[in-house]
């Protein structure tokens, strides 16, 4: 497995995606993140393992289509993003949940 610079890995993951579907996937140890579009699966795996100190079993990626947005007569597009669904090893789900959803 190639080695990645840990300073660059933190910039790959933008934010966790919390939707109804993502919440249902959390019951199966799958967590959804928004990542930069040029990130590869090995880079995403290394970034999640480095940020959350968990063992990643599998990474699925999805590049949804850009949505049109209109302001008056001007038509533009929302920014492109990539969605990564990361499967975490059994037993590590507590580590990642403590970071994503801290107790208040």
Curated annotation (Swiss-Prot):
Question: Disulphide bridges in this chain?
Answer: none
Which keywords are on file for this protein?
Answer: Ribonucleoprotein, Ribosomal protein, RNA-binding, rRNA-binding
Which residue stretches, if any, does this entry annotate as coiled coil? none
GO terms of biological process kind: translation
GO MF annotations for this entry? Answer: rRNA binding; structural constituent of ribosome
Q: Which GO terms describe its cellular component?
A: ribonucleoprotein complex; ribosome
Question: What stretches pass through the bilayer?
Answer: none
Question: What functional role does this protein have?
Answer: One of the early assembly proteins it binds 23S rRNA. One of the proteins that surrounds the polypeptide exit tunnel on the outside of the ribosome. Forms the main docking site for trigger factor binding to the ribosome.
This protein is called Large ribosomal subunit protein uL23
Natural source organism: Nostoc punctiforme (strain ATCC 29133 / PCC 73102)
Give the gene name: rplW
